[in-house]
């Protein structure tokens, strides 16, 4: 930068109002995304950031984001994440928790609350709007998986 002064007024910090988010971004069934930070809104070159809303008792379709890394910050609600070749792995996150999604990981976001929207902030490692929706067999419905052992009875067993 020797010999040249930078125009910090036009090339410095940007504030994007929550009232000016851009919903013209690739969508996944069951989820609404809106861009806050991208090249068009802030001049960003390597990052994408925005909001994600999953309605009460809803889940997204199974998808991945190619080479992109994603970070989800849970603002409110309860997130349930499923991932893997058959969505065989499950974890949950609540307000204040961060979720990291590596490249090419098939996953599904689920709102674990039946009566409240799941609100999150999403950050991606690139501007490329990659959403690859997948049609894969699911290991099982987590709502139908029961813990059965000598202490927990099988709810489908017939009483004698």
Where are these regions (language model features)?
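Conserved short histidine dyad/triad with adjacent acidic residue
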Residues: 32-38, 50-66, 103
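Short strand-connecting beta-turns/loops that link adjacent beta-strands
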Residues: 41-42, 67, 86, 114-115
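Conserved metal-binding segment of the jelly-roll/cupin
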Residues: 55-57, 83, 93-113, 123-125
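Short, charged/polar surface micro-motifs in flexible loops or helix N-caps
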Residues: 41-45, 55-59, 76-80, 129
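A short beta-strand-loop-beta hairpin characteristic of the jelly-roll/cupin
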Residues: 59, 67-95, 105
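A short, N-terminal "cap"/entry segment at the start of jelly-roll beta-barrel domains
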Residues: 1-46, 61, 131, 135-160
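A short hydrophobic beta-strand segment most commonly corresponding to one strand
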Residues: 51-52, 71, 100, 115-134
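Short glycine/proline-enriched turns and hinge-like loops at secondary-structure junctions
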Residues: 45-47, 65, 93, 112-114
């Amino acid at each position: 930068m020797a010999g040249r002064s930078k125009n910090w007024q036009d090339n410095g910090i940007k504030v994007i109002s929550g009232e000016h988010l851009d919903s013209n971004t690739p969508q996944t069934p069951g989820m609404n995304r809106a861009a806050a930070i991208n090249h068009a809104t802030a001049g960003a070159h390597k990052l994408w950031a925005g909001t994600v809303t999953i309605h009460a008792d809803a889940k997204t379709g199974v998808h991945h984001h190619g080479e992109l890394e994603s970070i989800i910050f849970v603002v409110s609600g309860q997130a349930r994440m499923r991932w893997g070749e058959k969505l065989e792995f499950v974890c949950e996150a609540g307000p204040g928790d961060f979720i990291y999604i590596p490249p090419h990981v098939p996953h599904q976001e689920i709102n674990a609350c039946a009566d409240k929207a799941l609100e999150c902030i999403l950050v991606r490692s690139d501007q490329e709007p990659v959403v690859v929706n997948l049609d894969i067999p699911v290991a099982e419905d987590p709502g139908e998986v029961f813990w059965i052992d000598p202490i927990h009875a099988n709810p489908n067993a017939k009483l004698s």
